[in-house]
Amino acid sequence: AKDLKTIQKDLYGVLKEIVAYYEKGTRYNIHREADGLIYAGDDGMQLTWMDAKIGDWVVTPRKGKAVEINALWYNALKIMSFLAREMNLHGESTRYDNLARKVCKSFHDVFWYDEGQYLYDSIDGEIRNSAIRPNQIFAVSLPYPMLSKAQQRRVVDVVKEQLDKLLFVNS
C-alpha cells in the first residue's frame, strides 16, 4: 500500500500492537530479551516454520533465538521506523531506530559463527546451534540486511555448498 493515510488509518496501530506484544511477551514464551533479540519456545514445543514434531518428539528443536525470526524482527523494526518517520511520528521513529540498532549489534555478537563464516541457526543461552540450515538466507534476502556484503556472500555460499552436497548425495 502506497497510500500513507490508509496505512496510518488501517494498519499502523495494528503493527504497533504486534511489536508491543513481542516486546512485552506473549504465549509460548515469545518475548524480547534484554539484548533486543526475540526468544521463543519451551521444551517440547515447535514454533518456527521448519520445526517438526511427531507425537511428543520435536525432531528439530529450535527453542531460543532463531536466526530467521530475528532477521524478520529487525526488518519489522526498520519498517516501523520508516512508517513512523513518513507519518511525522519522529519520537516513535527514533524509538524503533534505537531498538533496531540494538538488535543489529546483538545479532552480530550472537549469531555470526566466526569459525564457520556463517550464521548460527539458533541460540538458547550458551547453546549455539551451528547446523547449516537455509533459515540464515532470511538474514541476507530481506530489505534491511544486518550483515556486511562479504558476510552476506559467505552465508549464500555456505548454504549453496550444503545444498549441493545434499543434491549430490541424493542423486
Mark where each language-model region is:
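Short acidic alpha-helix initiation/capping motifs at coil-to-helix transition points
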Residues: 75, 98, 132-134
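Structural helix-adjacent loops and short alpha-helical linkers that scaffold large soluble proteins
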Residues: 1-16, 26, 84-101, 143-157
